Design a protein with these regions (language model features):
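Terminal targeting signals and extreme-terminal segments of soluble enzymes
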Residues: 1-134
């Protein structure tokens, strides 16, 4: 497995526009991703917007689902979020993903976002593995 992070936001799109996401495999069932909070990620209270944290989890956990499915395309079926803490501009957010179960068509996972070693968001989700015909 890779010890170094790679940029996964290479194509034009939402996550690249929002600062990008770095990603790495920890083991067959564990993955890690990270991003740094900038002023575009803040809400009116000056903390990271919950919508950005949701998008960050969707991107990072979705990439973990994709990698665990041998790089098959995967789409989010459900994503249940719990906002526990806060982060602010300049903070590095680290996401940890654990694949709980994988079938031929679904990936079930759990994810936590941490800032300064404190959990700020937790999520459980299900991704559909797509069978794309050539």
């Amino acid at each position: 497995m890779s010890n170094s992070f790679e940029q996964i936001s290479l194509k034009h799109g939402f996550m690249k526009h929002n600062g990008g996401v770095m990603f790495r495999n920890i083991s067959e069932n564990e993955y890690e991703f990270k991003s740094v909070i900038n002023e575009n990620h803040l809400n009116a209270a000056g903390i990271t917007h919950g919508g950005y944290l949701a998008a960050l989890i969707d991107a990072g956990a979705g990439t973990a689902a994709h990698r665990s499915a041998q790089n098959a395309p995967c789409v989010t079926i459900s994503l249940d979020l719990k906002y526990i803490g806060a982060s602010k501009i300049g903070d590095e957010i680290i996401g940890n993903v654990k694949i709980l179960k994988k079938t031929k068509t679904l990936v079930f996972l759990f994810c936590e976002l941490k800032c300064n070693d404190k959990i700020i968001t937790s999520a459980s989700g299900v991704w559909k593995i797509l069978k794309i015909k050539s």
